[in-house]
Swiss-Prot record:
GO terms for biological process: cell differentiation; spermatogenesis. The keyword Ion transport does not apply. Involved in nuclear basic protein transition: histones are replaced by spermatid specific proteins which are themselves replaced by protamines in late spermatids. GO terms for cellular component: nucleosome; nucleus. It comes from Holothuria tubulosa (Tubular sea cucumber). GO terms for molecular function: DNA binding. The keyword Nucleus applies. Residues 1-78 are annotated as: Disordered. Keywords: Chromosome, Developmental protein, Differentiation, DNA-binding, Nucleosome core, Nucleus, Spermatogenesis. This is Sperm-specific protein Phi-0. Residues 1-21, 31-57, 64-78 have a biased composition (Basic residues).
């Protein structure tokens, strides 16, 4: 039997993530579909809507949200 040569695409980490998501639980599959794809063409509509937000910007926004929530909670508990 001839071993099937792995294509270049299959070696890429994104491909590995995708195939891992296929094997994983439905929740992980959902996360994979939410992930910002490298090409907008392959993106699911929801991911395409999000793709305008760069990951770093999204992370910063999340930090700000967390911070303001903490401040609000602290002022209430006083």
């Amino acid at each position: 039997m001839v071993a099937r040569r792995q294509t270049k695409k299959a070696r890429k980490p994104a491909a590995r993530r995708r195939s891992a998501a296929k094997r994983a639980a439905p929740a992980a599959k959902k996360a994979a579909s939410r992930r910002r794809p490298k090409s907008a063409k392959k993106a699911k509509p929801a991911a395409r809507r999000r793709s305008s937000v760069k990951p770093k910007a999204a992370k910063a926004a999340a930090q700000v949200r967390r911070r303001s929530r903490r401040i609000r909670r602290a002022s209430v508990s006083k």
